[in-house]
Amino acid sequence: VDVETDHFYFKGLEAGGFLVKTDAHRLMLGVSYMGLGFDAGDSDNARMKKLDDRDGSFFANVTYAWRSQLGQITASIGADISGKSEGFMSDVSWMKRFDVAGFGVTPQVGVLFTSEKFNDYYYGISHAESKRSGLDAYSADAGVSPYFRLIGDYRISEKFSVYAEGTVRSLSKEIKDSPMVDGDIAYGFGAGVSYHF
């Protein structure tokens, strides 16, 4: 469920407040939960089962968005505040909403930067893990992953709208080269309800 007022917002796994909110400019400060993690016990791979778990983490985020007739450009940076990876992420994207037969269709293109500490925590393999699992030790550097997202929405009343979205992300070389990762592309899907004040 997404909720937005003149002063605060709740979207997905992020909540925060508006430091600036005008028709053209928005500056937001928020906290989000990044659910990326790895539970070795759930793996079907015998060697992966011998790795350490990777936990999800909380991020403090600063986001700026500029809106015009050409669409919206958004830039954000977030830092791990839970002491898991101690890394950070940065995202820059463009998006524009189109009305199509009563539905909203919003394409979005962007790039996601993930720091060395972030990548190494989630995708690196220590020498101790390598020794007990048989997987090659791996130390990840920072990387950039481009992505495309398509969002569809429909207003069902003055206050409520529903939406669904799909994301395709090309994994950075630093991520896809990890022995923990099988594949070059990550897919994501989501749906929800938005409440408009």
Regions found by a protein language model. Give the residues of each.
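Outer-membrane beta-barrel transmembrane domain signature
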Residues: 81-162, 167-176, 180-183, 195-197
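Mid-chain, structured segments of secreted extracytoplasmic proteins
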Residues: 13-48
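Transmembrane beta-strand segments that form the barrel wall of outer-membrane beta-barrel proteins
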Residues: 8-17, 45-48, 72-81
